[in-house]
């Protein structure tokens, strides 16, 4: 069993994040210790007021005691307010730090992790689970410690006031402890189910809202709605189970408390009549019982809150402990690479079983262009991914400028490779932000000059607000051509020496097509270029073409050389698959 599943270990790790806020932690702890006797003091003061002053008609003494009583109440209220503020401040600051750490950790994970982990699960870890962890500080350990100290202080004060009345009051106490234990165990199981269903629901919503276009195109709304209703029903049932346990537990506690109080009053009244119990003791003990049963009732709830926070903490640490980090950087750091790319007997599979690339070898000289063609699933996009070290090759070597890409640090490698994908991912923000990716070293002037260079400036300036136009999530308020142009400008401003272009297969208007072709010509000029080609206008100008089939290179050469073999795969693809648009 991993340490991340051990409650004590989770608690220790969570409190490790309190180091920058130790002053708040220790002040909260001190207040918890201070509040314990103050909470038990008011019933005892009531006992003294009745027996020593009211029963003896000592008005001056009663006034002094009443003033002390009010002072204790005001002090207790003020300290409890400060305690609540401090514990919640501690919790929010710790959650802020953990959330930053979780997100930074996710940014450094391999793509393989995201391939198998639903987006909703990571969202739940970063948002929902961390809100539950906040309970560990706001309502958890420190508050539980305060309640336990208060409980012990009240018991001590009760015994000091009257041993007999204390034992009478505690007759039903074992029943309360048993009820609290059963409640704690039942709610713990219920909460685990709720958290599991929340993650499942988040994943489902994230996936289907992102894919709403497909859902609507294939008129799958009713089926998706039915599936969501099923997930939602399971989630609701898990919540109702927890509500049921709460609905049963608190009335049971009230019944036990009322029975204890009634029995104590009956026995105490007999004691008053017989002279064994004073009136002040009888008046004070209902207050003692209320203060005794309240923390016990709340402790069961708070233990569950703590348990919920620890379960959520365990899930968070499971993510943080996941070692599927991005591949280690090498030690070679260079500002610019020349751009010679060599694949030497490279093989790769995503699952370690089914080969996607098999014994791929080719050399692309610096400044030359290469087109990769092949049917869907032949391995074209995979070659791009392993060149960027988004995945690691299993066999063979990929080198740039004669050096294994594993020896370059990732900043050098990826910083020298410009990537233009056919599925352009845009973030919510301005056109400027989507081009610069919030890089402060890229100025507005550079972006505008790059846009003019490839002819995209006219498209951006007609947008409301121009370059400040707010792009919605995934660029849904832009056309396919506009999204493509943003990716071209993005590649140009970063000035890579190696360009990888995955041409879009979607049809666009002739004007945009001409600008995109011009952009391709400008981007590839003088750069090592690898193009996954879908248009004749692109492949006719490249220096070399690779033809892939089932992860293997089956043909290579120039367009003229490959077309010289009419029965070859390239000739067949040329006639049946390529978009005949000419630049």
Please provide the spans of the model-predicted regions:
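Membrane-integrated ABC transporters
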Residues: 1-39, 54-66, 83-87, 91, ...
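Transmembrane helices of ABC transporter permease
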Residues: 20, 24-35, 67-72, 76, ...
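Hydrophobic alpha-helical segments in the permease module
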Residues: 69-80, 173-177, 246-260, 266, ...
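Helix-loop junctions and hydrophobic alpha-helical segments within the transmembrane domains
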Residues: 102, 106, 215, 316, ...
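Conserved catalytic Walker-motif region of ABC-type ATPase nucleotide-binding domains
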Residues: 106, 228, 316, 343-345
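Loop segments that connect adjacent transmembrane helices in multi-pass transporters
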Residues: 117-120, 193-241, 332
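Cytosolic ends of transmembrane helices, especially the final helix of ABC transmembrane type-1 domains
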Residues: 220, 244, 261-264, 291-319
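ABC-type nucleotide-binding domain
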Residues: 328, 334-583
């Amino acid at each position: 069993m991993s340490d991340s599943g051990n409650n004590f270990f989770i608690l220790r790790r969570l409190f490790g994040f309190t180091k920058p806020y130790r002053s708040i932690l220790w002040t909260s702890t001190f207040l918890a210790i201070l509040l314990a006797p103050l909470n038990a003091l008011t019933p005892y003061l009531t006992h003294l007021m009745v027996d020593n002053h009211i029963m003896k008609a000592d008005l001056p003494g009663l006034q002094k005691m009443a003033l002390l009583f009010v002072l204790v109440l005001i002090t207790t209220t003020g300290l409890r307010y400060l305690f609540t503020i401090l514990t919640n401040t501690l919790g929010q600051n710790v959650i802020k730090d953990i959330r930053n750490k979780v997100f930074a950790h996710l940014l450094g994970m391999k793509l393989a992790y995201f391939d198998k982990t639903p987006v909703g699960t990571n969202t739940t870890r970063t948002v929902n689970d961390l809100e539950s962890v906040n309970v560990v500080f706001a309502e958890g350990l420190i508050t539980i410690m305060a309640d336990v100290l208060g409980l012990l202080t009240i018991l001590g004060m009760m015994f000091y006031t009257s041993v007999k009345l204390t034992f009478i009051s505690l007759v039903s106490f074992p029943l309360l402890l048993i009820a609290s234990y059963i409640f704690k165990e039942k709610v713990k199981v219920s909460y685990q189910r709720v958290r599991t269903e929340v993650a499942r629901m988040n994943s489902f919503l994230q996936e289907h809202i992102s894919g709403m276009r497909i859902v609507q195109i294939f008129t799958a709304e009713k089926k998706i709605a039915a599936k969501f209703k099923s997930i939602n029903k399971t989630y609701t049932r898990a919540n109702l189970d927890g509500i049921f346990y709460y609905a049963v537990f608190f009335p049971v506690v009230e019944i036990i408390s009322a029975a204890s109080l009634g029995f104590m009053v009956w026995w105490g009244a007999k004691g008053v009549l017989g002279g064994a119990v004073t009136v002040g003791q009888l008046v004070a003990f209902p207050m003692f019982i209320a203060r005794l049963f309240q923390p016990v009732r709340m402790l069961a709830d708070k233990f569950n809150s703590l348990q919920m926070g620890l379960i959520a903490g365990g899930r968070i640490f499971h993510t943080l402990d996941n070692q599927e980090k991005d591949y280690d950087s090498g030690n070679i750091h260079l500002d610019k690479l020349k751009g010679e790319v060599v694949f030497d007997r490279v093989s790769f599979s995503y699952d370690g079983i089914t080969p996607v690339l098999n014994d791929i070898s080719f050399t692309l000289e610096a400044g030359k262009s290469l087109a990769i063609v092949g049917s869907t699933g032949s391995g074209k996009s995979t070659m791009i991914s392993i060149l960027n070290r988004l995945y690691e090759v299993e066999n063979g070597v990929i080198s740039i400028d004669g050096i294994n890409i594993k020896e370059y640090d990732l900043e050098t490698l990826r910083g020298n490779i410009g990537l233009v994908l056919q599925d352009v991912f845009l973030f919510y923000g301005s056109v400027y932000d989507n081009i610069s990716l919030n890089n402060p070293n890229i100025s507005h002037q550079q972006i505008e000059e790059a846009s003019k260079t490839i002819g995209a400036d006219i498209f951006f300036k007609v947008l409301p607000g121009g370059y400040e136009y707010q792009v919605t999530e995934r660029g849904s308020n832009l056309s396919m051509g506009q999204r493509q142009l943003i990716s071209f400008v993005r590649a140009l401003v970063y000035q890579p020496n190696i360009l990888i272009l995955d041409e879009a297969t979607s049809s666009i208007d002739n004007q945009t097509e001409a600008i995109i072709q011009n952009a391709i010509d400008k981007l590839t000029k003088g750069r090592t270029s690898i193009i996954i080609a879908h248009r004749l206008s692109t492949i006719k100008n490249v220096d070399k073409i690779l033809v892939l089939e089932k992860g293997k290179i089956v043909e290579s050469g120039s367009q003229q050389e490959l077309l010289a073999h009419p029965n070859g795969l390239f000739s067949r693809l040329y006639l049946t698959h390529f978009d005949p648009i000419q630049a």
